[in-house]
Amino acid sequence: MPRGDGRLNHDLLPGEKGPQDACGVFGVWAPGEEVAKLTYFGLYALQHRGQESAGIAVSNGSQILVFKDMGLVSQVFDETSLGSLQGHIAVGHARYSTTGASVWENAQPTFRATAHGSIALGHNGNLVNTAELAEMVADLPRQDGRATQVAATNDTDLVTALLAGQTDEDGKPLTIEESATKVLPKVKGAFSLVFMDEGTLYTARDPQGIRPLVLGRLERGWVVASETAALDICGASFVREVEPGELIAIDENGLRTSRFAEAKPKGCVFEYVYLARPDTDIAGRNVYLSRVEMGRRLAKEAPVEADLVIATPESGTPAAVGYAEASGIPFGVGLVKNAYVGRTFIQPSQTIRQLGIRLKLNPLKEVIRGKRMVVVDDSIVRGNTQRALVKMLREAGAAEVHIRISSPPVKWPCFFGIDFATRAELIANGMTVDEIATSMGADSLSYISLDAMIEATTIQKPNLCRACFDGEYPMALPDPQLLGKQLLETELAGGTDAADALRRP
């Protein structure tokens, strides 16, 4: 079936998407600047964090305009659409769905009218008390006898509705800033939020700081973004990270900050492994250097006699460089990646499906033939890609294929913004390392240890969420039935008060 952006919903390797992050967020307050174009370039730098939909909201001081659609940033926006978004405040979002289906209604920024004007909001992360938030929306004061309606089926629209609908004890509507101090302490999970009303840009980060969020300075304004790389691309200088549990407001009076919860840092270690751009810094540590160091430590923990080290491009390259450096085995390019293939633009026949990984990667036979190969990758989720890769390298003449992974086995699902499979689908959950190697057809398989990976980040272990590797989640989780990606679609089909809140007017 065609998607909203004209592409087709057909993966080349069914069931093997790899780790997918929730989203990328960007916000700017800069009078006199072309804030829509700055946001466009910021989202372009964050495209790796979400490819399903993109949107930008802009305020000129009196009204907020929102433009969003399905597709990549470059597919959604052009000169005409960007030119129509005039103002001095902007919020942008690039989405990959972790709660709610991939449909236009769930594209962000979300938008909602308030008693004082309106609000637009973008969210990176995933919430774990979505069912509770839906009940809270159902309990909001009724307007003209009608309950608050939520058109989307994602956790972000629930937060937007809560921020827009708060009142004090006398029933007087609260401002967005007042509402944020009341609502955010009740929101559980991972959230890096960028939101706005007509005159103010806001940003907030969950008390654990699970997803990254940074503050930057322009000559005539301020920028907030998921990653420092997005600051670089729009010419902003890095100021600091938004602290866990912090709310920042930026308007004509300057920047003000407040704390809505105590900071209990638990940054996602998988940002260092795979999710973030290599040219991003997180908590003062460069991601590329962390990945190279993971490769070095992997080589010391899992040496092997071989002729050549290659990477699964592009995410495995830094670790492969480190592995080659520490092992003394030459690093080379053995696989050529087609940068333009993600999902197919045609209906795949069975023949096309059998091509699978070859449409994404092609081996350099002259480099591979007769060689004992070390193939370095960042992670294994289900194993389909690595299995196809080993087969391809064998056919290209590799004498031996040794797989080395710069993260530990992924054994637990993520509920905080990475679309990992259910635990039953994770290959490392039901098989030993040797069994996985055999299933892939590899001569050997080794993973880096958890401690070595964490040491490579230079971040203290207690300050990192590593739940996908060790099952130690940074907060209490509700019943698994209340954590599904399609939770709100399921809720909508029911007959509860929360379902009434979710139905469209």
Language-model-derived ranges and their functions:
Residues 328-373, 384, 411-421:
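Short, glycine/charge-rich flexible loops or terminal/linker lids adjacent to PRPP-binding catalytic cores
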Residues 143-144, 169, 303-307, 325-332, ...:
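Secondary-structure transition/capping motifs at alpha-helix termini
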Residues 182, 230, 237-238, 245-246, ...:
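Phosphate/diphosphate-binding loops
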